[in-house]
């Protein structure tokens, strides 16, 4: 009898697998532990395992069938062996049913093999018992589409999901009374069944309600684990002090932050915007409706409206008390007609700004403003747009205008009381001074040594000293009281002294032979001045002539040739100004009457013009034509002194009201320049006679102001005046400072006389 054949079909092997020897596998993979590692695909491993199982089963079946077909008689134990054989045979048949494959092999569209698996039928012992119920896979489609069908959708396999049965009203009432666990009262839209919560979802909701972490097993307070090892250390790991960088802000972080800040400022980093907003902004288009508008020029007759005046202090809600009207002023304002009122309002004070009421005349003011703009004509005033700095002359720097005196070179001490006057001789060697002590002193200019002195006034002070300008004879004139003294100091060389004495003595013979003037009655006129010799003591000291006039002499000025000199006696009336002739010993009164009190007089340096200054004006007279030439009006309240430029076309005036005035005689009778640099009265002014463009003034504030005055011959160019230096050294005593000054005839040196009894040489 042929052995029964096995009815199970073996799975065909699709490809041959190469045989790998044990030696090679051990050498290649080490220990060869490859449990769970698949050499090929899962399908191939399943096929190979199925083949091995089928071979073992075939071998077992053949052995069992041979045993059953044998004719041998069983032993005593044969019955047991037979039962055992039947049991094993039943087991084999059962295993055949269990080991039956769960798929079928079919041909696919390409002619290849395709495995179709059977549907799993889950039972209680199945591993798929926890699988969820079939879900509805209709997608995002409203369930109302299936209202007319018995099913509500399809599952993953395409089978219909039938509509669940609906409970009656009694069931709904029972469900609402006896609420099951997990009941929500909602219906699942995808299945149509009640939506209940699982135990896990209920636990999550409970944790959320109790402010706990929803995650199961999360410990918010775990046990602290030491940072290093958990072993307590006796010695510190590092005892180094804390570095300073831990207490200071990081420079590297500051650099990074500043880099980001610069990028934000430059626009390279922009704030985050959602893509939707960014797209909306890009889609938005903004159009400039005035983009193509061209600027049109205003009408030629258009004049802009004037701006309203800004409010003043009286319009404040809490103005100062002086702006608030009194009761009388308020009544007067209320009684005045509105048209006659100076202001349309009365200043009012309020404690705070919130208490200020509305302005009741706002509409009236706006209306009046509109009327003004509409009816009032407008006038355009053309203003010169000139830079004020361009109108100022460009003055040179004082350093470029040197030389001029800056420091004290020599100090002259010897007078008791004030030094009222001083003068430098034409050669620039000697300095003559006169003071309150009644003495005339002659000093050596460079060394400050006193060389000669004479006491000409017993009780009167020496008001003025002057040297004769000519160099053929050296004569010094001085005035003390109403006496004028002409003297020849004994310090000069014998030849010059002899010539000077002869010049003074020649006038006595002319005065003896001259006829005296008679009055209308035939009587002799009283002489204006008396020329005589002084006492023998004064003659021995060098004082040769004494001229007595009617009043105290304050000013002496010589003519450039040295034969005439003028004197001024402010207290006299008719004989205030006198002109003396040295060669004839003659004194003349040129003015019968002056319109004011004479202050000083001076000869023109090159022309026959005589200047006389009163308190407010300076008059110039032509001595040849004997007529008035010009009246100069400085505008000062009280003229103290004046001096004429060596060129003869300019004049400076000093006044007691602290003004220094420069006059251009060819330009105008008014001052060309007025300077106010002193705090007190100006006593004396003087030009430099040696060709240097310098002049100076002396003031009662104890200072001297040095100026650079450039005068050109071009009539189209004005004089340039630059203050260059302020000299301070004299002390102020009894409100008097510097009394007089004089320039060296050649050098830029200046000598000043002060009320402190000293003289100073400035170089």
Swiss-Prot record:
It is found in: Nucleus, Nucleolus; Nucleus, Nucleoplasm. Its main location: nucleus. SMART domains: BOP1NT, WD40. The keyword Ribosomal protein does not apply. GO terms for biological process: maturation of 5.8S rRNA from tricistronic rRNA transcript (SSU-rRNA, 5.8S rRNA, LSU-rRNA); maturation of LSU-rRNA from tricistronic rRNA transcript (SSU-rRNA, 5.8S rRNA, LSU-rRNA). One of its GO terms (molecular function) is large ribosomal subunit rRNA binding. InterPro entries: BOP1/Erb1, BOP1_N_dom, WD40/YVTN_repeat-like_dom_sf, WD40_repeat_CS, WD40_repeat_dom_sf, WD40_rpt. The keyword rRNA processing applies. WD repeats lie at residues 414-453, 457-497, 593-633, 634-673, 677-717, 733-763. Residues 1-110, 318-341 are annotated as: Disordered. Belongs to the WD repeat BOP1/ERB1 family. HAMAP family: BOP1. Component of the NOP7 complex, which is required for maturation of the 25S and 5.8S ribosomal RNAs and formation of the 60S ribosome. This is Ribosome biogenesis protein erb1. It comes from Botryotinia fuckeliana (strain B05.10) (Noble rot fungus). The gene is erb1.
